[in-house]
Amino acid sequence: MKKLLSHSIEGTNHDNEDIYNVYKNYVWVMDGAIDLFDTPSKYGFSVSQVMQTLNKVLPKECKDYRGLKDILASAISQVQAAYLSSDLTYDYSESPTFAFMFGRFIGDIFEYIYLGDCYLICSQVYIITDSSFSPFVQANREEISQLKALQVPNLEFEVKEVYKRTRHLANKPSGYHIGSLDPECAYLSNQGYFPYSGQELMFMTDGFYNMFSVFGSVSEILSELQNLHLDGSVKLDDATVVVVRGD
């Protein structure tokens, strides 16, 4: 596999929670969700630390004879052991959660697993992503819009409470599936494959895709993101893109 391009730009929070890698015939992008529960004070580590540890552990688990879900579950188990105590019970929705797109070339097939709003774009046309979280995003927007219209006091606190309630639905029966420090989340992921015939494959976190859907050009987006960072007046999400082509 040949890496044609990779770029990750930290957002306004100045603590990049995106990770990516191209390792042998494997490629992934993952997007750590914003911390809503003061993880450093509660657990002693940050979302960014957890994501970087996962990025270091995952290549060691990448064996072609193993399924992608098994590989990811094993990697998460190691990260869990590094950060969480086996003597305690955790609500994994309050520890770091993350979206992911994880794939590999096996012969003339590309196979992949994914959860959340990361994206795989084939030949700049065919888009693969998990849309199951979209209704929750829309519900959040509507509730926050109502709060603003009502001019509620302490709006920032109330908005955060909206996001917290949604986060508590992570991997719950009435909620949505997402990556977490529970290894079982890997087995909740969507999966697919397609015959590979030489096309470019683009992997993106939502921070990059949201601009790609407007500009349609990776180079234009990178330029625009740099300009927005210099301007400093716009709140930006972390944004990551990886472009690869099979051998």
Describe each PLM feature range.
Residues 1-247:
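PP2C/PPM-type serine/threonine phosphatase catalytic domain
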